[in-house]
Regions:
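Generic detector of multi-pass transmembrane helix bundles and their immediately adjacent loops
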Residues: 1-98, 103
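Conserved helix-loop functional segments at active or binding sites
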Residues: 5-9, 36, 40, 117-122, ...
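A glycine-rich phosphate-binding loop feature that marks nucleotide/adenosyl-phosphate handling sites
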Residues: 19-26, 48-54, 129-139, 195-202, ...
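Catalytic or ion-coupling anion/metal-binding cores of large enzyme and transporter domains
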Residues: 46, 204, 270-273, 282, ...
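Non-transmembrane, amphipathic alpha-helical segments
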Residues: 47, 56, 60, 64, ...
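Divalent metal-dependent catalytic cores for phosphoryl transfer on phosphate-bearing substrates
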Residues: 95-257, 261-264, 270-274
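Cytosolic regulatory/linker segments at or just downstream of nucleotide-handling modules
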Residues: 274-299
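Long, low-complexity, intrinsically disordered segments
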Residues: 325-349
Length: 349
């Protein structure tokens, strides 16, 4: 029993249960052989006894466990790594609906999951739980997808025509809607908790500041605050940081390493100053490790590419002794940055 428990404690595939059964079978054969030495008259009898009883005791429980595991998970309300892998399948009904109704939110969730999984691995947290939780953290946005900027490609922002208080109420409501959808799709509690905790009790600061600028009457911060609770685990705290950083990184005109590092420092400092991490077991060492991991991941994501010229351009360059490929690539990179900066200014204006 001890051998089997140790062998499957970190199982993330159903085949791991079969592998564990082989270890149990081998140990059982050895134990049965030792105890049967005094009762068996021949080696053949000893071998048959050890292989049969040892194998029966090792392989049969594995077959039973493989079939009973889904039933036991539901009855005991335990979420195993195997179940987390199933929840991370893009064909899961909730994720499939999210992709169809809010594709921008879906892609954001995928990116947050990548960042969170790497960060969790860096500090020894549950990386599979981080990935699965990140997939579902914005599930409530599919009810009104056009109210969230990542789904507004090529369309007007409806918040431009709404009072800030109403905009804040709509945006904040995706938490409650997400919790309702988590119940609808019968998501485990370990996954559902990512929905409220990834925003904690933060302020919807954009709409709060907008309301203060527009309204002559007093504006109360509590009307613009997420309901919480604050992150209660390392995993939900990691997703909170990754969520804010990933969204903000898309606004950088030049997402180079220095700008990304400054952005990460600013956002994480804001989360700490707002006391959002007070109720989770993350240490300052963990937080610094998470920041370093996110920086590595984002730097890789926003890497530069060489701009390969087409055949006509190549012909012209050959005739006029054009600059080498590295020089052309550098120029192309700067052009891309300048274009991005110009587009960002146009959007701001």
């Amino acid at each position: 029993g001890m051998v089997g428990a140790l062998a499957v404690q970190n199982a993330n595939k159903r085949w791991n249960v079969v592998t564990a059964s082989l270890w149990v079978w081998a140990i059982n054969v050895l134990v049965v052989a030792i105890f049967a030495l005094s009762n068996c008259d021949s080696f053949e009898e000893l071998a048959i006894c050890a292989l049969f009883y040892g194998g029966l005791n090792g392989l049969l429980p594995a077959l039973i466990a493989s079939g009973a595991l889904p039933v036991l998970e539901g009855a005991c309300k335990v979420t195993t790594h195997i179940r987390l892998l199933e929840l991370a399948n893009p064909n899961e009904p909730a994720l499939h609906e999210l992709l169809n109704r809010a594709p921008g939110t879906y892609m954001h969730s995928i990116m947050v999951a990548n960042l969170a999984e790497a960060a969790a691995q860096a500090i020894g947290a549950d990386s599979m739980l981080c990935r699965a939780g990140a997939y579902y953290h914005d599930l409530g946005k599919m009810r009104q997808p056009n109210m969230f900027v990542e789904n507004q490609t090529g369309h007007e922002n409806p918040h431009d025509k709404l009072p800030p208080a109403l905009s804040a109420m709509i945006v904040i409501s995706h938490i409650k809607l997400g919790q309702e959808m988590a119940k609808k799709y019968k998501l485990p509690p370990e996954i559902a908790k990512f929905i409220p905790e990834h925003h904690g009790t933060n302020l919807a600061s954009f709409f709060y500041q907008k309301a203060k600028m527009q309204d002559d009457e007093p504006v109360f911060a509590e009307d613009f605050r997420y309901p919480g609770p604050r992150p209660q685990s390392k995993e939900t705290a990691i997703v909170m940081m990754c969520d804010g950083i990933e969204a903000a990184s898309r606004t950088l005109p030049v997402p180079n390493r220095e700008n990304l590092k400054n952005l990460i420092d600013k956002i994480v400092s804001g989360i700490i100053n707002n006391r959002q991490l007070d109720e989770c077991p993350l240490s300052m060492r963990d937080i610094n490790t998470v920041k370093a991991s996110i920086l590595r991941s984002l730097t890789s994501h926003y890497h530069n590419r060489v701009a390969y010229p087409d055949s006509k351009t190549m012909g012209k360059r050959s005739a006029t002794s054009a600059p080498s490929v590295p020089q052309a690539a550098a120029t192309s990179s700067e052009d891309v940055k300048a274009k991005t900066a110009t587009e960002a200014k146009k959007k701001d204006s």
